[in-house]
From Swiss-Prot:
This is 4-deoxy-L-threo-5-hexosulose-uronate ketol-isomerase. Its EC number is 5.3.1.17. It holds the Pfam family KduI. NCBIfam families: PRK00924.1 (NF002091). Catalyzes the isomerization of 5-dehydro-4-deoxy-D-glucuronate to 3-deoxy-D-glycero-2,5-hexodiulosonate. It comes from Pectobacterium carotovorum subsp. carotovorum. Keywords: Isomerase, Metal-binding, Zinc. It catalyses: 5-dehydro-4-deoxy-D-glucuronate = 3-deoxy-D-glycero-2,5-hexodiulosonate. GO terms for biological process: D-galacturonate catabolic process; D-glucuronate catabolic process; pectin catabolic process. Binds 1 zinc ion per subunit.
Amino acid sequence: MDVRQSVHSEHAKTLDTTELRKKFLIEQIFTPNQYTMTYSHIDRIVVGGIMPVDGEITFDDGIGKQFGVNYFLERRELGLINIGGPAKIVIDGTSYEVGNEEALYVGKGAKALAFSSLDSAKPAKLYYNSAPAHAVFPTRIITQDDAIKAPLGDVKTCNKRTICKYLVPEVVETCQLSMGLTRLAEGSNWNSMPTHTHERRMEVYFYFDMAEDTIIFHMMGEPHETRHLVMHNEQAVISPSWSIHTGVGTKNYAFIWGMIGENLTFDDMDHIAMLDLR
């Protein structure tokens, strides 16, 4: 497990490119026949990917000890979105099939989780976030039809996109985890611009569906002290509450966002005026 400590905004603005990447960028999300796990001290989020190709993947028996509990989700909830082929997920004996760009919410207390692909030639790619949880809510699949779709932006401002909200209160009950998927239209390359921060929440972006020869310049930092990270396909970035989070790609792309913190109000944002950015 990769552990990332919290970084103060005053410290962050002194970091060079290498250190910024080390502190905030998660370069490897998917590894065939393995799971990855990054544990951030910021709001205690866990981020990772599960990619079963041949056979079944389960979390290691000792993973609970790293969280001071008996098993991973003893005091946690988990949300995942599949960006690969269809997956079979067995949770405490109950089987779920999760298709491409479908989500699964797993409630606190789920003990035995097993992940496999229905077709090894088209392996599942299960991107997940996990947050501390205080209550038990039912495990359930969220399909694309279940998700709330919201068009945003405009071709004229190069930010036309569709937000698909999977784990939000209007769709599924969670303790504090929100997740969704945003896809940019062809010809658009800016996400979340005009930008914002969340004083009351942190967020993680996971960029995917990028052509091999394309990159994204992900903007971060305080509004008056912005920095950038160059990112490639299927990489994630941790965004503290004090940081803006926006990006521009050399071609259109998609990304999954996950938030945890004080509330589940999607629109609870602190908007930043364009003229105030530095």
